[in-house]
Amino acid sequence: MGLLKSHLTVCLPPSVPFLILVSTLATAKSVTNSTLNGTDVVLGSVPVIIARTDHIIVKEGNSALINCSAFGIPDLEYKWYNSVGKLLKEMDDEKERGGGKWQMLDGGLLNITKVSFSDRGKYTCVASNIYGTINNTVTLRVIFTSGDMGVYYMVVCLVAFTIVMILNITRLCMMSSHLKKTEKAINEFFRTEGAEKLQKAFEIAKRIPIITSAKTLELAKVTQFKTMEFARYIEELARSVPLPPLIMNCRTIMEEIMEVVGLEEQGQNFVRHTPEGQEAPDRDEVYTIPNSLKRSESPTADSDASSLHEQPQQIAIKVSVHPQSKKDHVDDQEGENLEVKDEEETEPSEEHSPETAEPSTDITTTELTSEEASPVEAPERELPPAHLETTEPAVTCDRNTCIIYESHV
C-alpha cells in the first residue's frame, strides 16, 4: 500500500516551457513496468514540433542557422535534406568541398557557412526516436549581392555601345565617300561643260543694265529680259550639276525678286505691244517695244546693247487737251478780232473795186505763211501738221482749250 501512495517524480530540462511539457504528458503513452515487489517505472513521448518557421532570408556570403524546432523523449535523432532530396552529411561535405560548409549542431540545428546563391531552396528536418518520427520544412532565400550580374549588364551595355559606334562609323564612311564622289563629279563638270555655261552666264550678267530713275521703260524691259536670261542659264547650270535635289530653283528665286522689285507689275501696266497700222488707245502713256529689243534667235539668246539706240517701229503718242492760260486766251481773242476786221474790210473793197482785192489776199497769205513758219523753226521737238485744216477744230470746239496733234512715226 505504501508503494501505491508513493508519488512519481519526473526530471525535466529547465529549457522546456511548462505548457509544452503539459501537452507532451497528455499525449504521451505511459509505459509502466512493475513487478509485484514494486520495480522502477520509465516514461517517454513521441516527437512534436514546438515552433514552425516558414522561411529564412540570408544575404549571399553570410552564414545561415536553421532550427528543426522538434522535441521528444527520449532524445531525437536529426537528419537534414536539401531541396533535391539529398541527405546532408558533414563527412561528405568535408570530402567534396574541403569541410566547413554544413555543420550539424546539437538540438537539431543546421549551420550553413558562406551561403551562395545556389544554396537557396527548401530544407527538411527529420526528427525520430523509438516512439515516432516527425519532419519540419524551412525555406532558405538568398539575397543576390554578387557582382556577376553587374558584369553581365556591363558586358551587354558595352556590346550595344560597340554596335552603335560601328554603325555610326560606317555611316560616316559612306557619307565621306559620297561627298568625295560628288566633289569629284563637280570638279569634272566645271572643267568641261560647266565652264562654258558659267562663261555664258557671266557674259549675260555683264550686259544687264542698271535701272535708274533716268532710264526709260524700254531699258527696264531689257533689264528684265537679261535678268530672266541669266536666271535661265543659272538654272540650267544648277540642274546639270550631278548633285542631290538640294539646289533651289533659280527661276523661282528670280521671280520672287521681280515681285519684290515690282518690275513684272510695271511691265504689265506700262509696257505692251501694239500691232503696226493700229492706232494707239486713248491712255496716258503707251509704249511699244521694238523687235530689236526682243529676244533674238541666236543660240545664246542674248540681245545687243546697241539695239537700245535704234528707232522703234511704232510709237503711239498721246493727244493732250489742256485749258489755256488767261494771257494766251486774251491774245487769241485779239487775233480773232483782227481777222474778223480784216475780212470785213476786204468784203467792201471787193464790192467796190476788184483790183484792190488782190493786196488784201496777199496780206492774208503772208499771215498764213508766217503762221506756218512758226512750227517749222523747231523741227526737233515735233513735226508740223500735214494740212492747215487740222487747226480748224481747235477754233470751233472751244475757245478756252488748246488741242495739240502729234503724228505717229
Swiss-Prot record:
User: What are the TM regions of this chain, as residue ranges?
Assistant: 149-169
Q: Which residues are glycosylated?
A: N33, N37, N67, N111, N135
Q: What main location does UniProt list?
A: membrane
The PTM Phosphoserine maps to S298, S303, S306, S307
Which residue spans belong to the Extracellular compartment? 29-148
Matching InterPro entries: Ig-like_dom, Ig-like_dom_sf, Ig-like_fold, Ig_sub, Ig_sub2
In the bilayer, the protein is annotated as:
Single-pass type I membrane protein
Q: Which GO terms describe its cellular component?
A: cell junction; cytoplasm; nucleoplasm; nucleus; plasma membrane
Localized where? Cell membrane; Nucleus; Cytoplasm
| Pfam family membership, one | Ig_3
- Mind listing the UniProt keywords for this protein, alphabetically? Cell membrane, Cytoplasm, Disulfide bond, Glycoprotein, Immunoglobulin domain, Membrane, Nucleus, Phosphoprotein, Signal, Transmembrane, Transmembrane helix
Q: State whether keyword 4Fe-4S applies.
A: no
Q: What does this protein do?
A: May participate in the nuclear signaling of EGFR and MAPK1/ERK2.
Official protein name in the record: Microfibrillar-associated protein 3-like
From which organism does this entry originate? Rattus norvegicus (Rat)
